[in-house]
Amino acid sequence: MAGTNDSCPLVKNILLLDSEGKRVAVKYYSDDWATNASKLAFEKYVFSKTSKTNARTEAEITLLESNIVVYKFAQDLHFFVTGGENENELVLSSVLQGFFDAVALLLRNNVEKMEALENLDLIFLCLDEMVDQGMVLETDANVIAGKVAMQSAEASGSLSEQTLTQALATAREHLARSLLT
């Protein structure tokens, strides 16, 4: 796996925890945590080591248990992306920012636990669009949100057409804002 790591960035997990360190949405791509108990222990450890930091405006990076963890907080949600100790921090940070921004687009900038729980399917679709078996597929939030909105619309039919239009309009607005800054 070391040879693969040199050529293709790998993500070990993506965690979305609440302000108490409890799971909202998590996805593991590595066998480093073989049991559910070890996964929960890792989540608790990461949360306890990062919860006192101020990662609200920009992402922070730390090294925990031979893993690079990049993280960012918003409202009552804590976003984490974990990679190996030799992984490129900028790639992990791009994955984190893409996930955070895509979730913000899909939740219409209402990035809080209750809204996330009500739209958990969209969050898991974001994860699926971003990373597959640990390999980074996409980090552009507009692309991710657009694909998720289309998948969501296909799954639920005509009722979601309005949601798709709203998501695409929000994505367009976000893109325009990012081009102006």
UniProtKB/Swiss-Prot annotation:
Bilayer disposition of the protein: Peripheral membrane protein
Subcellular location: Cytoplasm; Golgi apparatus membrane; Cytoplasmic vesicle, COPI-coated vesicle membrane
A single GO BP: protein transport
Keyword set, alphabetical order: Cytoplasm, Cytoplasmic vesicle, ER-Golgi transport, Golgi apparatus, Membrane, Protein transport, Transport
Coiled-coil segments on the chain, per record: none
Gene3D superfamilies per the UniProt record, alphabetical: 3.30.450.60
Recorded GO CC terms: COPI vesicle coat; cytosol; Golgi membrane; plasma membrane
Entry superkingdom: Eukaryota
UniProt-listed Pfam families: Clat_adaptor_s
Quaternary structure (record): Oligomeric complex that consists of at least the alpha, beta, beta', gamma, delta, epsilon and zeta subunits.
Family annotation (PANTHER family): COATOMER SUBUNIT ZETA-3, ZETA-COAT PROTEIN
Family (UniProt): Belongs to the adaptor complexes small subunit family.
Annotated function: The coatomer is a cytosolic protein complex that binds to dilysine motifs and reversibly associates with Golgi non-clathrin-coated vesicles, which further mediate biosynthetic protein transport from the ER, via the Golgi up to the trans Golgi network. Coatomer complex is required for budding from Golgi membranes, and is essential for the retrograde Golgi-to-ER transport of dilysine-tagged proteins. The zeta subunit may be involved in regulating the coat assembly and, hence, the rate of biosynthetic protein transport due to its association-dissociation properties with the coatomer complex.
Protein name, UniProt field: Coatomer subunit zeta-3
